[in-house]
Amino acid sequence: MRRNPISNEEVFWNPQESKIDLDALAGVDAIIHLAGAGVGDKRWTKRYKSEILNSRLLGTTTIANAVNELKPKVFISSSAIGWYGETGNRAVTESDRGGDDFLAAVCREWEAAADLVSGVRTVKIRTGLVLEPTGGALGRMLPLFRFGLGGKLGNGKQWWSWITLHDELRAIEFILENQ
C-alpha cells in the first residue's frame, strides 16, 4: 500500500485521513501490516517520537477498520520487542508484562489498535531488529563499520534480539500457513 501507488499491484491508502482502497483489497486471504516510522531513522526529538507513535496508531487503526469490513482469513500486525522494555539478559515470553519506557508504551498502543479487529484471526508479531545487509539497521551500520567508524550502540550493555529478513519472512509465511 502506498499513498501514491505507482503500479497496479499497489493499493492506495492514507492513514492520516483513515483512507484505504477497499475495492482493491476485496477477496484477499490475508493482510500483513508492517509499516511505521523507523525507530533508528532519526534522532528521537519530541516531534519524531510523536511520528513513531502516530505512524503506527493511524496505520494500524486504518487497516484494522479495513480488516473488519473485508474479513480476510488472517490479519498479521507487526509489533516489536520494545514491548518488554529493557530486560537485560532475562528471557521473555508473550505472557510477560510490558515495560514502562517510550517504546513499550508505543507497542501497547500499537497492539491495542490491532485489537480493534474482531471476527478475524489476528496475529501480533513482536519482532526484534530485522537485519539485512542492504537495508534497515544493519544496512545503515555496515558502511560505518567498514570505514572503521562504527562504535557501540546505545550504552553498549543493552540486549537486542534480532532476526534476519529471510527468517522474518519465513516466520510470516509460517503464520499464514498454520493456525
Annotate each PLM feature.
Residues 79-80, 112-133:
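Conserved beta-loop-beta element that borders a ligand/cofactor-binding pocket
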Residues 51-59, 98-105, 109, 163:
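Glycine-rich NAD(P)-binding loop of the Rossmann-fold in SDR/ketoreductase-type enzymes
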Residues 7-58:
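NAD(P)H-binding glycine-rich loop region in Rossmannoid oxidoreductase-like domains
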Residues 142-150, 158-179:
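Alpha-helical substrate-binding/gating segment
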